[in-house]
A protein has these predicted regions:
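Double-stranded RNA-binding/processing signature
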Residues: 1-184
Length: 184
């Protein structure tokens, strides 16, 4: 349901885009972090029923659980209200603000391109970690010369770097840096 609706949306909105670009764009929409972001925007995590142990160990903030809940909600809407209602929900809550979602999904790559255009390199530094082994939270900073120094947090080092890269792009955009991902 989600992939079908996303594919149709991308194709009808970009009929001249090549297949590879369409595939990458769809992947950026239906990936776990993006779906978790969509779920958080509608506060879905507040309504997920979890076991006590899962709730106590941070399950309510875990991307995998939140994104799965969004997919389950879409399935429930489809079963209860039919294809048209599920499609409307996907358009309203998943396919909205695609530029921002694509920026989040590709943030490390896009940031690297932007920073290299300024003759610099992005450095990621692990500044801390907290929590038990099964529910670690990593903190990193990303910096590039005097362009930016920003923080990111995630349940993996990679996720923390991705969040820091996204924050750096938002910072650069806010300060007027023009950029567009290559091949998008």
């Amino acid at each position: 349901m989600l992939e079908l609706t996303s594919s149709e949306f991308i194709y009808t909105g970009n009929p001249d885009m090549n297949e590879g670009k369409m595939t990458r764009l769809r992947a950026s929409i239906v990936c776990e972090p993006t779906l978790a972001m969509c779920a958080r925007q509608i506060h879905l995590q507040e309504y997920i029923m979890l076991g006590k142990g899962e709730d106590l160990t941070g399950g309510r903030t875990r991307d995998s659980i939140i994104s799965d809940a969004l997919e389950a909600l879409i399935g429930a809407i489809y079963l209860d209200g039919g294809f048209a209602n599920a499609k409307e929900f996907i358009h309203r809550f998943v396919l909205n603000d695609l530029e921002n979602k694509q920026l989040f999904y590709d943030s490390k790559t896009i940031l690297q391109e932007v920073v290299q255009a300024h003759g610099l390199e992005v450095e990621y530094e692990l500044t801390g970690e907290e929590g038990p082994e099964h529910d670690k939270k990593f903190h990193v900073i990303a910096k590039a010369g005097n362009l930016f120094v920003v923080k990111g947090t995630g349940h993996t080092k990679k996720a923390a770097q991705q969040q820091a890269a996204y924050n750096a792009l938002l910072h650069l955009k806010k300060n007027g840096t023009q950029f567009m991902p290559k091949g998008k």
